[in-house]
């Protein structure tokens, strides 16, 4: 049985691909660095779209707020081009949000690796050396 795949999901997926290409190719703002679009959630009435992004090299800088500000200012430009490429009667308003799930995932992976390493240290320290 085929999995239900709604129109808003299809539009969101296509918007994700098209926005990634448009940002890479057309947006010339120096505040926009290496941006990855992780997801696009489109409302049921196609009036609004939440665009979730990550920014490479954001450690210790204000790159994320600057990138969000630049993308928000370029939103009308991006909507215009999306309308041409996707041939939609009404292009959703774009709302950009930072996707913290990637950084949270990296943090959790580091915690797990540290716990496993500590566990191995305790196991190695508790076992007598049987090799001769």
UniProtKB/Swiss-Prot annotation:
GO terms for biological process: maturation of SSU-rRNA. GO terms for molecular function: ribosomal small subunit binding. Disulfide bonds: none annotated. Gene3D superfamilies: 3.30.300.20. It comes from the Bacteria. The keyword Cytoplasm applies. Belongs to the RbfA family. This is Ribosome-binding factor A.
């Amino acid at each position: 049985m085929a999995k239900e795949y709604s129109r808003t999901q299809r539009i969101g997926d296509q918007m994700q691909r098209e926005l990634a290409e448009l940002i890479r190719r057309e947006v010339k703002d120096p505040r926009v660095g290496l941006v990855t679009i992780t997801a696009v959630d489109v409302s049921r009435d196609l009036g609004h779209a939440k665009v979730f992004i990550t920014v490479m090299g954001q450690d210790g800088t204000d790159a994320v707020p600057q990138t969000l500000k630049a993308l928000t200012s370029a939103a009308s430009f991006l909507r215009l081009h999306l309308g041409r490429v996707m041939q939609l009667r009404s292009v959703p308003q774009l709302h950009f949000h930072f996707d913290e799930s990637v950084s949270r995932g990296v943090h959790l992976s580091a915690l797990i690796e540290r716990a496993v390493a500590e566990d191995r240290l305790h196991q190695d320290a508790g076992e007598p050396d049987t090799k001769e």
